[in-house]
Amino acid sequence: MTAMNYPHAIILFAHGSRDALWRRPIEAVANDMKQLSPATQVACAYLELTEPDLPTTVAGLVQTGVNAIRIVPMFLGVGRHAREDLPLLLQDLIIQYPGVTFELSHAIGEEPEMTRAMAAIALKSNP
């Protein structure tokens, strides 16, 4: 990967878990994104208990020449992690990488498309 191929990237940021199976849905979303948009570099990062963490993921992307990163919190709602922990991490990254533009999206669960999709899935499983 070079800067020419991937000047922008999207990081799917999730909580993390000691259970290795927990990360599969997040990685599945990343893989689907890569198939839908091969020109978009997509990576996963985790707050705790799972690697890589956000600073490690950002460092790897910057090394490939990425100069703009959008972080998508893969949380259903805005709890303490999305409201407090992630903005603090982001502040540190902005200082560490002044040449990189960072954008923080809303928590994925707050997006109307996501709430509609969850409603449809829940209704589908209704006997």
PLM feature spans:
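Active-site-proximal alpha-helix that buttresses catalytic centers in soluble enzyme cores
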Residues: 1-127
